[in-house]
Amino acid sequence: MKKIILFFACFLILIGSAKTSFAESDTLKRLKKQGYATVAVANEPPYSDIKSDGYVTGAAPDVARAVLTILGVEELKAEVIMYGAMIPALQAKRVDMATSGLYIKPDRCESIIYSEPDLCGAEAFAVPAGNPNNLLTYEDIAANADLKMTTCAGCAEEKYALERGVQAGQIVYFDTPPSGIKMLQQGRVDVFALSGLGTQDLLQKTNDPNLELIMPISGVPIGCAGAAFNMNDIEFRAEYNMALAKLKATGEFAAIIEPYGFSAEATAGESYLTRCPDGK
């Protein structure tokens, strides 16, 4: 009798384990069935880059593509959306996720949820060669009301600037990063602000000796980005995190992001739990 009871107990444990191991979120089931995930990206190399044939590459979508493959989702379909419009797109479920260097910020965590960090890096300015206004911090911009800076609406850099005393009237928003660099070249603004590697990539492509890179920016924390999801996709976020951890453990993660200039080590000690209030 004891053997029968023990066998039955073991059977129940196995059934429970199987359910835990193989149960999938409704979101993942849907994505696997349709064969693709719709992903919001911004055209900001090296985070994300839209090729002339429409193919989307870059560190963030390449990581997402690899993670989705592990999860059994065959294709990533990208939708180009500016950073400021990504959260509304996620909330409205126009996209399944966003992956394009969208920094994990406490205020954003009130509207969306994030995966574990996949890309971390410093901030930068582009200025006229010689840095005539000696701009090394956002406080330097704030100290001179005559100065104008450019960045994108909804970007982390906009918030960094406003938090450090830059007036809203000093900010001129660009539509795309290259158009922001064009403003700087034309003298319409005094400084361009964006992620470090994004700014560096733009200046290398522009190849203008009259422009200079200032990196890192003092007084600004290292920014970390992760894949972003609708607030209700907690189970899918957990599945994504498990696959991302697997990708990191195999070394494939480093092989994907390091050619773009990012460091796999930089994400090692980071977690969305410490960057989002209440560990959302």
Where are these regions (language model features)?
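Extracytoplasmic small-molecule ligand-binding "clamshell" domains
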Residues: 23-101, 110
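Ligand-binding clefts/hinges and TM-proximal coupling segments of bilobed small-molecule sensing domains
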Residues: 25, 156-172, 212, 244-280
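Short helix-initiation/N-cap motifs at beta->coil->alpha
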Residues: 76-88, 133-136, 172-186, 221-223
